[in-house]
Structures are given as structure tokens and as C-alpha cells.
Amino acid sequence: IGALQGAVDRVLTQPTQSIVRNVAVVNSLYK
């Protein structure tokens, strides 16, 4: 269960980081 939770966290964290990065780029473009 712990390993599965770690895998789920990893899968969810990577797209979240890319989304945050994209949002930061868009915000910098529109400022």
C-alpha cells in the first residue's frame, strides 16, 4: 500500500509541477 501510494503521489506530482510551471510562464507573459 505504501509503495502504491508513493507511485500515485509521483504520478500526480509530475503533471502538477508542469501545470504550475506553465501557469507561471503564462502569468509572466501577460504581466
UniProtKB/Swiss-Prot annotation:
Membrane topology field: Peripheral membrane protein
Localization terms from the record: Cytoplasm, Cytosol; Golgi apparatus membrane
Major subcellular location class: cytoplasm
Keywords from the named record: Cytoplasm, Golgi apparatus, Membrane, Protein transport, Transport
GO cellular component: cytosol; Golgi membrane
Disulphide connectivity of cysteines: none
One record GO biological process: protein transport
Function: Required for normal Golgi function.
Complex and partners: Component of the conserved oligomeric Golgi complex which is composed of eight different subunits and is required for normal Golgi morphology and localization.
Similarity remark: Belongs to the COG5 family.
Name of the molecule in the record: Conserved oligomeric Golgi complex subunit 5
Organism annotation: Bos taurus (Bovine)
Protein encoded by which gene: COG5
